[in-house]
Amino acid sequence: VKSTLAALLLLCLTAAASAEETAIGFRSSTLPDAQDNRPLQMVVWYPAATAATPELIADNPVFVGARGAPDAPPAAGEHPLVVLSHGYGGNWGNQVWLASALARQGYIVAAVNHPGTTSKDRSPQAAAQLWQRPKDLSRAIDAVLAQPTQFGAVAKQRIAAVGHSVGGWTVMEIAGARFDPVLFARDCDIHPKLGGCIGYKQMNPAGTPVGKAELVKDLSDKRVTAVVSLDLGLSRGFTDASLAALPVPALVIAGGVPTEDMSPELESADMVRRMPKASTQYVEIGDATHFSFMAICKPGGMALIEEDSPGDGMICRDGEGGRPRESIQQQVVELITAFLAHTGS
């Protein structure tokens, strides 16, 4: 028995070392648009051809970054693609832990900063164009597909989208869910303290006839073959019919620590009840908060955030008495990779 355990331990250590040694490339670019009124910052993590010297990416006094080799040549062969969507007021750096982990497992991962709802750009005019978020991901897919010499060749039948918070709403839209602003406004009268309702009110995307018309459109991208939502918001505005007919598999992960403005029972779990049972997986992580899906805070990081923006230090908190964020995120990575492998995405 001891020899078997020793062999298993050696196998695990070898696999871990191999994962660490996998060369990961990193590139940053800005995508112009036809009208030049919504330039999009995009970063891409990808399997690299050589073990180029890695650097810490998105590492700062508050958050732990991840290692990648800037501008390294991409590895040969085709690789599945994942596009990432951050939450309201966030940025691509929030999910570096996930992007780098997926790239180590052979995925090309593209993440964007959504204009108007990113910490890098809080323009009210851009924020009001909520319907542009799914289109941002489609633009990222276009850009990666068009530049195989930069990022590697994409296995076009394996394209997935992953999003946190309103990024979860974004990937559900790109999968085929349809939003009804009238339904959502009515629901927010009943649940005004939900974070999705508060953020939606600030953005006011249905404040004009044009905005309302854009929000109800089909924003799906048929190239996307699977989606993952991480503690999403705004889900109560999705129509029952569109959720019931969602054409791609979905993994819905929720933080199990409820707060006044974020409840899995009213968001993720409620949405899953309206989705196809055969192609939907739901996991509620009991010791995860809404912010457990963001980058790991460094010691002293919470104090620095509080100093700069009192009250926002809560983004460093996970479930009381629960596991450290690193362990929660390892579970999330395992859930996502197993789901994508199972669905062939």
What kind of feature is each model-predicted range?
Residues 20-84, 104, 264, 301:
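Domain-level recognition of soluble alpha/beta enzyme cores
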Residues 23, 245-325:
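Active-site-adjacent alpha-helix of alpha/beta-hydrolase-fold enzymes
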Residues 126-152, 156, 169, 173, ...:
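Alpha/beta-hydrolase active-site loop
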Residues 58-62, 89, 93-97, 113-135, ...:
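Cap/lid segment of the alpha/beta-hydrolase catalytic domain
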Residues 161-163:
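Short beta-strand immediately N-terminal to the catalytic nucleophile in serine-hydrolase-like folds
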Residues 49-68, 185-239, 258-262:
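Mobile cap/lid helix-loop segments that gate and shape the active-site cleft of serine hydrolases
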Residues 66-79, 84-122, 236, 258-262:
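Short substrate-entry loop that stabilizes the transition state in hydrolases
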Residues 12-17:
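N-terminal signal peptide c-region/cleavage motif recognized by signal peptidases
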